């Protein structure tokens, strides 16, 4: 049976890609999930795996082609039925059929009904002014002898000059909208129009975490050849808090009109790249340690900035986290990634003088902002979730570096 290999959505709202490699040739066998093409978009360079197993009977794209969603790229015969069709060849446009010439027959304007004939693809007559023109499929009645009308010669119309291009207004310049920027814009509008957010901000005492991180980074350098970022600890604390508040790891299913709670916690990490925002995700973060999460953050960020992110990295995210603090910002109003339920933002940590045990002390304070879908959770729910995240950070619950 012939199966069409079509270009599917590569994620992040991008609808086209450029073929950079073809990994098989006609006649080769291929397995399910084996890569057949490599496609580059404005955000990712990704392999396209085959959804079918069988023999490749046609490859309908070339290296350098730009393909769009739904476009057939190859044909794979799984051997279950008729052989796959040969590769489609470019079809020359058929020569236009000769247009029959009819001599207009002067006749009075009529309102007679259209006449239909059996077997005619298009039937009847069109009444135009005082002449009758047959339609294909209907045999015209015999014309009455009449002198041909005299056509008066007319002079060729004077072509209208094209309007001159409008000059750019003084003091302005234009910036072309890239495919990636357009995709980001569409995603933001979709989220903003469909998800009414409730947003709360918390102050978290991260003093103990700061001290703990300083004490273990020597170990992390010697054992893992890396320091553990604060962001990795924050992500781990959020994942821990979701155990008590799983609704924030859910999504609304509009077709079934219900909330779906995801078993896996796939944490989307907002990465600022030279070309724009991209949100790959850490898969099954609920099974990972702080060190594992730290490694994933570094890996995803590096590959996002070098356009080496793969399709699976962008799909199936369940909750997102962004770090305003990396830019020195404390607060913001993050936009929830549709169709997720929640996004958590961490701000720039600051040393602050606070009251402590009858006196004052200097504490490290983390601003933490949560935006959640107000259709399905209330501000009080967000408040309890935020307090649980704060507790995880302040008490160093399950944040050990081993």
From Swiss-Prot:
The lineage of its organism: Bacteria, Bacillati, Mycoplasmatota, Mycoplasmoidales, Mycoplasmoidaceae. The keyword Acyltransferase applies. The modification N6-lipoyllysine is found at residue 43. The keyword Acyltransferase applies. This is Dihydrolipoyllysine-residue acetyltransferase component of pyruvate dehydrogenase complex. The active site is at residue 374. It comes from the Bacteria. Belongs to the 2-oxoacid dehydrogenase family. It comes from Mycoplasma pneumoniae (strain ATCC 29342 / M129 / Subtype 1) (Mycoplasmoides pneumoniae). The gene is pdhC. It is an enzyme of class 2 (transferase).
